Amino acid sequence: MFQARPAPVSDFEQLFVAPADESVPVAPSRWIALTDLQHFDADPQWSRDGKMVYFTSNRDGYTCLWALRLDSVTKRSAGQPFAVQHFHGTPRAHTLYPTFSVGPDRIVISLDQLQSDLWMMHLPEGH
């Protein structure tokens, strides 16, 4: 799984998965797009069970944490991305690039604010 800017004139990036092949680089024609090229989607991480991808996106005007359910067989998106955690409002609105780590039942998020913050949120059932 990776992020890329497939259109050289685009300001946005999108998320892809590709079959693993250690012998040769995987041709872009074999990349499977998970998100569209309408937003800046970045920092993808698998959920522990492989059924979900968590990522940061500016799709609501702020850089927030989003998720996307995947088809367990094809690894294609199985629906629309949905917000997991918003970072709107002062001072969180000034967060540019949160970093995060996905655990079995929680996500730990590091925010770049005037003073560094470390957040931990429990994932609801089904996440």
What do the predicted segments below correspond to?
Residues M1-P25, T35-D41, T56-A67, S72, ...:
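A flexible loop/linker signature enriched in serine peptidases of the S9 family
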Residues F16-V17, W31, S47, L65-A67, ...:
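A generic structural signal for ordered secondary structure
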Residues E22-I32, V73-F82, G126-H127:
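Beta-strand initiation motifs
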Residues I32-D43, R76-F100:
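Conserved blade-ending motifs and adjacent loop-strand segments that build the rim/top face
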Residues D49-K51, D105:
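Short coil/turn segments that connect the beta-strands within blades of beta-propeller domains
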Residues H94-H127:
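Blade-level signature of beta-propeller repeat domains, shared across WD40, Kelch, NHL, RCC1
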